[in-house]
Amino acid sequence: MSQFTHINASGEANMVDVSAKAETVREARAEAFVQMSAETLELIVSGSHHKGDVFATARIAGIQAAKKTWDLIPLCHPLLLTKVEVQLEAIESENKVRIESVCKLAGKTGVEMEALTAASVAALTIYDMCKAVQKDIVIENVRLLEKTGGKSGHFKVES
């Protein structure tokens, strides 16, 4: 079994030293779902939500969040991201929104946390913008879908 990388021999949490690692191109994809009523989803899809374009706001929030991951998650490194993409898709047959984020860089540490943060904050932004019309919205199934690069290599969720 793999060991925790952020815990030292004394059991204390520390930021991992990546100074000796080689720079490689690294990319990660994550997703999140936001479950809501058909009426709330229709407000978003039709563009008639009183707060404006929910998807555009959530997309920008996700991008901003990816860039601030190091400031939100205590042991994450500040990274020079070269790409952050957040896509939102209404799945009207299931009354939900699917969010997929992609983060990329050439660096010494991975971007999984940045991709997960982007998807999570985009989902939280949808909740924030819609809570006035529906309070029981559910954010669910936030997960890493795929990552490439680095020592641990390629990981992809089994469908």
Curated annotation (Swiss-Prot):
Q: Which domain of life is it from?
A: Bacteria
Q: Where does substrate bind?
A: 75-77, 113-114
Where are the active-site residues found?
A: 128
SUPFAM superfamilies associated with the record: Molybdenum cofactor biosynthesis protein C, MoaC
Gene3D superfamilies cross-referenced by the UniProt entry: Molybdopterin cofactor biosynthesis C (MoaC) domain
Q: What catalytic reaction does the record list? A: (8S)-3',8-cyclo-7,8-dihydroguanosine 5'-triphosphate = cyclic pyranopterin phosphate + diphosphate
Q: In which pathway does it act?
A: Cofactor biosynthesis; molybdopterin biosynthesis
Q: Give a GO molecular function annotation for the protein.
A: cyclic pyranopterin monophosphate synthase activity
Q: Which UniProt keywords apply?
A: Lyase, Molybdenum cofactor biosynthesis
Enzyme class label: lyase
Functional summary from the UniProt entry: Catalyzes the conversion of (8S)-3',8-cyclo-7,8-dihydroguanosine 5'-triphosphate to cyclic pyranopterin monophosphate (cPMP).
Subunit (UniProt)? Homohexamer; trimer of dimers.
| Record's protein name | Cyclic pyranopterin monophosphate synthase
